[in-house]
UniProtKB/Swiss-Prot annotation:
Family, as annotated: Belongs to the pantothenate synthetase family.
E.C. numbers: 6.3.2.1
Catalytic residues of the enzyme: H37
Amino-acid positions noted as binding (R)-pantoate in the UniProt annotation, renumbered to this chain: Q61, Q155
Biological role: Catalyzes the condensation of pantoate with beta-alanine in an ATP-dependent reaction via a pantoyl-adenylate intermediate.
PANTHER family in the cross-refs: CYTIDYLATE KINASE/PANTOATE-BETA-ALANINE LIGASE, PANTOATE--BETA-ALANINE LIGASE
Residue positions binding ATP: 30-37, 149-152, 178, 186-189
UniProt cross-references to InterPro entries, sorted A to Z: Cyt_trans-like (IPR004821), Pantoate_ligase (IPR003721), Pantoate_ligase_C (IPR042176), Rossmann-like_a/b/a_fold (IPR014729)
Other information: The reaction proceeds by a bi uni uni bi ping pong mechanism.
Protein known as: Pantothenate synthetase
GO MF term list: ATP binding; pantoate-beta-alanine ligase activity
Keyword Nucleotide-binding appears in the UniProt entry: yes
Length: 298
């Protein structure tokens, strides 16, 4: 695996692969890699000849300086994992490489509406930082396809919209959330949990599945449903931060025409903010099929 910290030599290698007719897949990460990231790599292999990954803890998307400082950095272990997955290239720029004139003078990419609703409302500027760094990385790597996890549902929607709006010739592939055996969505932040917190963390996914089961049974008093779910989290000493039920396509409030909804959840467990989501099919046929599957599992 070739490792580059600067843009120009990386671009030269990319040009060589392009001249050879190679199709390039890109996986941008912030490091501290886990099985979810490696699943992105394996998915990318199905779509391209060359796999390029990046590790960059992007200061522009952090609202809290302490959060940025405490973000886990495990570059040596990350390199070992990517090498074992036969990744062809790793890009590890510094903030000075990505933002040579500083954050204040950096041109930004802002995706309207999506960047300011839901999680964007409580984390102002976060998604602007995400779209800016991803757009810049796309310009540097020039991939044919890019893979992102569906765990960050709003981020995936944001990037897809940016690619459409900016006429970028890139296929954006969403990859299903990878979970621990107890249901917790894999995340780099999970490493910050204490043993006791880790034992309580599956409550987030269980509560989300409970909401889903209620919705599939026809319950649509969403405000009351969210409050009940919040009570379940508090009972396990999780502090609800955000719980939204939205149309999975528009991220707006569900309507009578909504056939696919998404539950978006965030909660604090100690000092760690956990996020998760679950898509819910609301069509009658889908509900009946899922109910039958649940009965078979019993």
């Amino acid at each position: 695996m070739e490792i580059f910290a600067d843009i120009l030599p990386l671009r030269e290698q990319i040009k060589t692969w392009k001249r050879e007719g190679k199709r390039i897949a890109f996986i941008p990460t912030m490091g501290n890699l886990h099985e979810g990231h490696l699943t992105l790599v394996r998915t990318a292999r199905e779509h391209a000849d060359i796999i390029v990954a990046s590790i960059f803890v992007n200061p522009m998307q952090f609202n809290n300086v302490d959060d940025l400082t405490n973000y886990p950095r495990t570059i040596d272990e990350d390199i070992e994992k990517l090498t074992s997955e036969n990744v062809d290239m790793l890009f590890t720029p510094t903030p000075e490489v990505m933002y040579p004139d500083g954050l204040d003078k950096q041109t930004v990419v802002d995706v309207p509406v999506i960047s300011t609703i839901l999680e964007g409302a409580s984390r102002p500027g976060h998604f602007k930082g995400v779209s800016t760094v991803v757009a810049k990385l796309f310009n540097i790597v020039q991939p044919d396809v890019a893979c992102f996890g569906e765990k960050d549902f709003q981020q995936l929607a944001l990037i897809r919209q940016m690619v459409i709006d900016m006429a970028m010739d890139i296929d954006v592939v969403g990859v299903a959330t990878v979970r621990e055996m107890d249901g917790l969505a894999m995340s780099s932040r999970n490493n910050l949990l204490t043993l006791n917190e880790r034992q309580r963390s599956p409550v987030l996914a269980r509560t989300m599945r409970w909401i889903s089961s209620q919705m599939r049974r026809g319950r649509n008093d969403y405000e009351s449903l969210i409050e009940d779910a919040s009570d379940q989290l508090r009972a396990a000493d999780l502090q609800p931060d955000e719980i939204f039920i939205r149309d999975a396509r528009t991220l707006q409030e569900p309507t009578e025409e909504t056939t696919q909804a998404v539950i978006l959840m965030a909660a604090f467990l100690g000092q760690v903010r956990l996020i998760d989501n679950l898509v819910v099919e609301l069509t009658t046929a889908a509900n009946e099929e899922e109910e039958e599957e649940e009965e078979e599992e019993k």
